[in-house]
């Protein structure tokens, strides 16, 4: 059973709404809803009811809450007990997708450096398919990337669903990517063809028979965002990668469907690989950072 679902439930109780819980956990509101629905299915009970503007625990939910607090306390105790007596050392080879490396990994690295200062960390940004193969071929110890399939030989820890968003500058807000059979006289700005969110976007356009003027390939997410802001075209990126630009109005979100499409972020290593103290500490830092946001 996924401990994050219990953390989500605890956060909804503390914050009083799914929206505020999603903001605190740095995930989408749909992810919070999904976690609660999974728990309700698991225990065959309704956990929340809406009273006024607040989400309140049902009677059955109140019965479960003390046990959930106890479970999270026990898990914290287990984590402490699992810590190695000696400080982690040696070399650790980590590979990550660019958006995760740029926007989610700095917090991970900060935690890791504080806990494992003796470890020689090798960190590389790679395509998600290449990361999967590097882990399978023992060319890397740990990968933080988006799930792309064919990973049964990996030990995976899912880090949550990351919502994708279609963005443009306010000056080209009149393009339409929802009406089938339409041609948009703008460019699609993205990175390499094997990019996971590029594949999702282009697949959706094919299904809708929508075309664009051309595709511009750039190697960095920052370059993509700067070109979009300069009215050169649109892009399709993880929401967390453009959150600041959306908040300040430099970019706007374009309609792309009734529900946001998502990709699964995960931390993984080869299932047959012995987990070193450095690997254990790094994975722990990844999980803590993603839960904390």
UniProtKB/Swiss-Prot annotation:
Keyword DNA-binding: yes
MF term (GO), any: DNA-binding transcription factor activity
Keywords: DNA-binding, Transcription, Transcription regulation
DNA-binding region: 18-37
Disulphide bridges: none
Start and end residues of each HTH lysR-type domain: 1-58
InterPro entries reported in the protein's UniProt record: LysR_subst-bd (IPR005119), Tscrpt_reg_HTH_LysR (IPR000847), WH-like_DNA-bd_sf (IPR036388), WH_DNA-bd_sf (IPR036390)
Family as reported in the entry's similarity comment: Belongs to the LysR transcriptional regulatory family.
PANTHER family named among the record's database cross-references: HTH-TYPE TRANSCRIPTIONAL ACTIVATOR CMPR, HTH-TYPE TRANSCRIPTIONAL REGULATOR
Official protein name in the record: Uncharacterized HTH-type transcriptional regulator YfiE
Annotated source species: Escherichia coli (strain K12)
Organism lineage: Bacteria, Pseudomonadati, Pseudomonadota, Gammaproteobacteria, Enterobacterales
